[in-house]
């Protein structure tokens, strides 16, 4: 096995990393407080613990400046104003459980993402992405409810699910850039169409105060996973639904400024960019970049994190773990797992068992690396946050 110096870590992430083989997965019994019992399959040298239960459509994580974990909850699949941002508090590393789940913000419209930023003056800010807007508010360390009023930094198309052009994709995702910028992904209004608003199917960039807003990247049908790692802004992207069960790929990109990633006229299949015959594009698809990597069609790639610590177990070292939420149609059966991805290598499975036959036990949504030996992931079907650690 080729080993990579820790000094190179993320600056080297776009080149070949250590070669690995599909790890053997073994059943790990899961017993939830609501009485449900099943098994999730993962490597034998890891254990999995339900760290928080009783949530609804729990989604994306962020760690506050005071080290507490925050997580969003969209409540259900409807366009609603019942969403919540929770504080996951009183963490016990021995038991792998949170002692308290505290509602921090309530009555929110489909909150998918929350992030924190500390400005040059040392002021902490909480950023919240709802369907219709991006807001920020001052954050005081240790607080259990907001201490200041939110200010609106940006507004987004908010036609909901009844929009005449389709009404798709209610989520917005925030990433804090290592360059001091704020990024927000806005999904398309449709399965495949020519959009009426430029902000749709894009990632936008702005200053922390909301000024100098611009389109950063386009042609991204729904970039739900968005995270700045090292020197790169990475994104997962969901492909169109009308090209059959085997096409197109779900894709993963290291985004570049002012690049068009092709949707709706171009799509990826087995990593190659092809033209969608439904749409005519004067320039064709020859200048559309191929993805960093790709996932099975309709597997719904969402949140992810990168495991680069020199002391990380070799199973996941120098790999991305990606939550494949799963196809809406369970009969397709793609996704429903945590995938393990290294550039230039075959996709591997770190965890599965969320779908057994026609029975759905969960749908992973986001992954958050805690340290070199452990991570959290959210399950928005069961309303559970899991803790996974090396034994």
List each language-model region with its residue ranges.
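Asp-box/WD-like beta-propeller blade repeats and closely related beta-sheet repeat scaffolds
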Residues: 105-111, 115-117, 130-176
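Short loop/turn segments immediately following beta-strands, especially the blade-tip
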Residues: 88-96, 137-145, 256-261, 340-344, ...
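Conserved beta-strand position repeated across blades of beta-propeller domains
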Residues: 52, 62, 115, 175, ...
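Beta-strand-rich domains and repeat architectures in extracellular enzymes and scaffolds
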Residues: 26-33, 49-78, 299-306, 322
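Beta-propeller domain segments
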Residues: 21-44, 171, 188-191, 201, ...
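Blade-loop segments of beta-propeller domains
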Residues: 81-119
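Surface loop/turn motifs at the tips and blade-to-blade linkers of beta-strand repeat domains
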Residues: 51-54, 103-109, 154-158, 162-166, ...
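Conserved beta-propeller blade signature
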Residues: 68-72, 122-128, 181-185, 232-236, ...
């Amino acid at each position: 096995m080729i080993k990579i110096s820790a000094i190179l870590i993320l600056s080297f992430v776009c080149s070949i990393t250590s070669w690995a083989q599909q790890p053997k997965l073994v059943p790990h019994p899961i017993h939830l407080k609501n009485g449900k019992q099943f098994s999730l399959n993962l490597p034998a040298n890891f254990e999995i613990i339900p760290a928080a239960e009783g949530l609804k459509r729990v989604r994306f994580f962020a760690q506050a400046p005071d080290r507490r974990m925050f997580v969003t909850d969209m409540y259900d699949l409807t366009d609603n104003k019942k969403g919540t941002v929770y504080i996951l508090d009183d963490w016990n590393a021995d038991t792998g459980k949170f002692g308290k789940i505290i509602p921090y913000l309530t009555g929110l419209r489909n909150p998918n993402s929350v992030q924190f930023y500390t400005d040059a003056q040392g002021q902490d800010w909480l950023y919240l992405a709802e369907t219709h807007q991006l807001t920020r508010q001052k954050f005081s360390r240790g607080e259990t409810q907001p201490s200041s009023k939110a200010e609106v930094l940006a507004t987004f198309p908010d036609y909901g699910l009844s929009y005449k052009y389709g009404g798709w994709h209610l989520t917005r995702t925030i990433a804090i850039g290592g360059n001091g910028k704020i990024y927000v992904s806005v999904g398309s209004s449709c399965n495949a169409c020519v959009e009426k608003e430029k902000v749709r199917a894009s990632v936008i960039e702005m200053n922390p105060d909301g000024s100098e807003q611009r389109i950063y990247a386009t042609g991204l049908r729904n970039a739900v996973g968005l995270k700045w790692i090292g020197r790169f802004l990475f994104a997962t992207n969901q492909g169109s639904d009308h090209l059959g069960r085997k096409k197109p790929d779900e894709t993963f990109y290291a985004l570049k400024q002012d690049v068009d990633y092709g949707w709706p006229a171009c799509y990826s299949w087995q990593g190659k960019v092809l033209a969608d015959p439904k749409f005519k594009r004067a320039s064709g698809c020859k200048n559309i970049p191929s993805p960093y990597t790709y996932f099975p069609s309709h597997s719904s790639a969402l949140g992810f994190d990168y495991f680069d610590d020199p002391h990380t177990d070799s199973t996941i070292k120098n790999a991305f773990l990606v939550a494949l939420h799963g196809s809406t149609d369970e009969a397709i059966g793609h996704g429903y797992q945590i995938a393990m991805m290294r550039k230039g290598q075959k996709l591997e499975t770190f965890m599965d068992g969320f779908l057994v036959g026609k029975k759905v036990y969960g749908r992973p949504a986001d992954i958050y690396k805690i340290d070199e030996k452990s991570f959290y992931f959210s399950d928005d079907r069961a309303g559970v946050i899991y803790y996974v650690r090396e034994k």
